[in-house]
From Swiss-Prot:
GO cellular component: virion component
Organism: Monkeypox virus
Subunit structure: Part of a complex composed of the kinase OPG054, OPG092, OPG100, OPG114, OPG115, OPG142 and OPG157.
Keywords, ordered alphabetically: Late protein, Virion
Lineage: Viruses, Varidnaviria, Bamfordvirae, Nucleocytoviricota, Pokkesviricetes
Function (record text): Late protein which is part of a large complex required for early virion morphogenesis. This complex participates in the formation of virosomes and the incorporation of virosomal contents into nascent immature virions.
Entry keyword annotation includes S-adenosyl-L-methionine: no
Assigned protein family: Belongs to the orthopoxvirus OPG114 family.
Protein name, UniProt field: Core protein OPG114
Major localisation: virion
Induction context: Expressed in the late phase of the viral replicative cycle.
UniProt-annotated location(s): Virion
Domain of life according to the entry: Viruses
Amino acid sequence: MSINIDIKKITDLLNSSILFPDDLQELLREKYIVLERKSNGTPTVAHIYKTMARFDNKSIYRIAKFLFMNRPDVIKLLFLEDVEPLLPYKSINISINNTEYPQLEGPIGTKIALLELFNAFRTGISEPIPYYYLPLRKDINNIVTK
């Protein structure tokens, strides 16, 4: 009996950041999640935090700095240059992000950046939490069923 295993195919499959059922279940149990998205809005990475993003202790700004770390135009638009990024407890890759982001500038760019930021905060559980944490299930179901 011969088993034909293509190591390159298996390696490519594992490197393509597949969302496994265990990862999905873990996300649905997490309370504070921040989604990083492609330019078309598809989630690419779910960053898990152990504490809530808050305005009073400025953690929401630190999370935003981490979220837009690779997009200096957005950091400049949102006045986050002097803020230290807050690293997540854990990050789970959902899909591959190989797209370029458009350069954002001016009032329209600021509105787009804020819209992206406010749509990033998600929760996997149904406990009472601040209004800016939206349910995660819709985004995850869209990714899994594609």
